[in-house]
Amino acid sequence: MAINLFTSESVSEGHPDKIADQISDAVLDEILKQDPKARVACETYVKTGMALVGGEITTSAWVDIENLTRQVICDIGYTHSDMGFDAHSCAVLNAIGKQSPDINQGVDRADPLEQGAGDQGIMFGYATNETDVLMPAPITYAHRLMEQQAKVRKSGKLDWLRPDAKSQLTFAYENNKIVGIDAVVLSTQHAEHVSQKDLVEGVMEEIIKPVLPSEWLSQNTKYFINPTGRFVIGGPMGDCGLTGRKIIVDTYGGAARHGGGAFSGKDPSKVDRSAAYAARYVAKNIVAAGLADRCEIQLSYAIGVADPTSIMVETFGTGRVSNETLVKLIYQNFDLRPYGLIKMLDLIQPIYRETAAYGHFGREHFPWEQTDKAEALRAGAGL
């Protein structure tokens, strides 16, 4: 049987695009704490010495945008000009306006159940039984490497680590089963003084080995640790960052399709975000129920219309029942209207800043990761 390779990447919380995502979602969380009915579309741009926060927000809440932005940057770890970005001295610009009343007219309804979608669009959700969190292994472990980098950096164990970092893992599959890790790429920003030898050794011992299962590593596994040999200039000084530019990192690492809509900075009335979470919830419950080994869901919506305009299921030949049966079970067990899915997943709560780094899926404490519908799906399928 032929060996197939598949690769996914992740980025750290200090990556410029992720700084922007976290600021946008921090603004959303602070608003939702005060005003659950707020309409928020918050975008952030970061570059050397500045953060620009803009977008369209309609709310009764008041948020100190400047202070909140500085706090997020500080929490990430950009606290000194030596890093090229300093939470205490960077400029913070506020360019927030109000959401168009034309959109409000299409979304708001006297009967909440008839709340229309905030925009048209397509959303995908995916699940696979190749990991215990029912996510693809490459993106799952790429995220875990980045979480470990932040943990080691913040503990001071490797005091030369800096916030910006990226990981990339290539997994080898045979007959759709993991047989090993073919390549590990990890690049991390670092202080000027550390040698390449010490950096490679530290990353291998403190970041890579504690995270990657040893049974997937072999003498044939290739390692690329800071392959350029130098990564001192990073963060917003190295590259500008924008909200919503890491949509594959945020989802399935390329293992499933993507509708194109980003998540961060958007309140749950935006189906780009909430329906993508619901699609993951549906797919995960189908796999958890044993109805398929892999499952991809597509949802679509029209602006101002409550019911989804389509539901598609693909199980890649792994389904225990037909795709048509699965679609019927979805209609019977999940309310995928905007208000219905918001209520079903309890989305009006300040949980979004945490989603903005290390992936939105495969982290069990988020409500869309529950598998509470699996039993009903099994029963409905007659299994």
Swiss-Prot record:
Keywords: ATP-binding, Cytoplasm, Magnesium, Metal-binding, Nucleotide-binding, One-carbon metabolism, Potassium, Transferase. It comes from Actinobacillus pleuropneumoniae serotype 5b (strain L20). K(+) binds at E43. Signal peptide: none annotated. GO terms for molecular function: ATP binding; magnesium ion binding; methionine adenosyltransferase activity. Its main location: cytoplasm. This is S-adenosylmethionine synthase. ATP binds at H15, D164, A165, K166, R230, F231, D239, R245, K246, A262, K266.
